[in-house]
Amino acid sequence: MNIVVTGATSFVGTGAVKELLDRGHCVFAVLRENSAKADKLLQNGKIPENLTILEEDLGNLGNLVNRMEEHCDVFLHMGWRGAGNSSRKDAGIQERSVQDALNAVRTAKALGCRRFLFTGSQAEYGVHNTLMDETITCRPASPYGEAKLKVRREAEKLCRELSLDYGHACIFSTYGPGDHPWSLISTC
């Protein structure tokens, strides 16, 4: 399959790209222009055979339609402005990320994708003093959590309107190579 991936150099993104390539898929990794983390996608110092790197701002994902000749099957949207701790409370940055995600859905349709997969966050649920699962009521406690939940609701609706399958991967505490030393797992 041909898979477009935003957020490809993020902690989760690098692992996802590696796994997709290992499974024989062609990956179109969308990176910020002059990304300082582009080398995370290299294998043995080289760009893997089935990997195409495309530099594009998250706010301009529609430009991919004119830049890509290949038909794409899946759009994996992990890119997000303001995912870092200092920006999670900035409602303006978070709203821009919501609009980026909805434009990513439209771009996915224009590229011929059948599926759109978005990575959500435990922040959608807010704080609960009980065991959590997908049935628990969402009560986000930050602009970041509110924005991720807004994308889940609006992108799913937009995908239905555009006849795209929608997938929502709500990510809770991940860990592994390259994890931040201040992450939940690393500090336990």
Positions of PLM-derived features:
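Conserved Rossmann-fold NAD(P)-dependent oxidoreductase catalytic core, especially the SDR/UDP-sugar
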Residues: 77, 81, 102-143
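N-terminal Rossmann NAD(P)H-binding glycine-rich loop of SDR-like oxidoreductase domains
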Residues: 3-23
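Conserved glycine-rich Rossmann-like NAD(P)H-binding loop of the short-chain dehydrogenase/reductase
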Residues: 25-36
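NAD(P)H-binding glycine-rich loop region in Rossmannoid oxidoreductase-like domains
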Residues: 52-96
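Conserved catalytic-core motifs of eukaryotic protein kinase domains, centered on the activation segment
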Residues: 40, 85-92, 127-131, 180
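Active-site helix of classical SDR
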Residues: 147
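Conserved cofactor-binding/catalytic machinery of classical short-chain dehydrogenase/reductase
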Residues: 60, 74, 100-103, 115, ...
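NAD(P)-dependent short-chain dehydrogenase/reductase
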Residues: 153-188
